Design a protein with these regions (language model features):
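Charged catalytic and DNA/RNA-contacting regions of genome-maintenance
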Residues: 1-112, 121, 125-141, 145-203
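Short intracellular "coupling" helices and adjacent cytoplasmic loop segments at the cytosolic face
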Residues: 116-117
């Protein structure tokens, strides 16, 4: 078995670490982790490496005064509508890009959204109604989700076409690419709709 197709050639230590992590998940979850179907390599060459002292001194996510998020850069910037957005913003702050093209694409996207107030408000309204899809998928994959959580996934998927529609006439490359990646998974949403009662019990 070779992982070279995933960009893991000459990365024996990383491959061993990934294997150990999968084994740990298998042992702790007491089942196959079938929802992990791909592997992506990560390199620090594309990002600024921030050590613990730098993170503390810049107060990116925690205040030096009491260690809480209050007063940190993250707390000031976080106007996200979803838990997924909050996690993404935190990751971007902790892993700043080094590539000029990537930085400029994000800036162009921010500029377009900032200049189009109606688009911004419509997107925020759709996202405000969305549940934490990443968390829901994880719970469903592990077999720990209840019926209401599966319905929450369906309700969130139903909002994606609206988001895609709002992004259709955007010109920023970052937003165009984002729109192309969004998949409403209509068949899955329909399947859930037909399989689960709209008002199931809690357990």
């Amino acid at each position: 078995l070779s992982l070279d197709g995933f960009g893991c050639e000459n990365m024996s230590a990383a491959t061993c670490a990934a294997g150990a992590l999968i084994y740990y998940l298998h042992e702790t979850q007491k089942q196959e982790v079938q929802h992990i179907q791909s592997l992506r390599t990560y390199t620090t060459h594309s990002f600024v490496v921030l050590d613990a002292d730098t993170l503390r001194n810049l107060e990116l996510t925690q205040s030096m005064r009491d260690g809480s998020s209050k007063g940190s850069l993250l707390e000031m910037l976080d106007q996200t509508m979803t838990s997924m957005g909050a996690r993404c913003l935190k990751q971007w702050l902790l892993q700043p890009h080094l590539k000029t093209d990537s930085i400029n694409q994000r800036l162009e996207a921010v500029d377009e959204l900032k200049s189009r107030i109606s688009l911004q408000e419509e997107l925020r309204e759709a996202l405000r109604q969305m549940y934490d899809i990443q968390r829901l998928i994880s719970r469903i994959s592990l077999g720990t989700a209840n019926a209401r959580e599966v319905l929450a996934l369906k309700d969130s998927l139903r909002l994606i076409p609206s988001v895609k529609l709002q992004l259709e006439d955007c010109s920023a490359p970052f937003l165009i690419d984002l729109n192309q990646q969004l998949d409403p998974m209509t068949d899955l949403a329909d399947l859930i709709d037909n399989a689960i009662h709209p008002e199931p019990p809690v357990t």
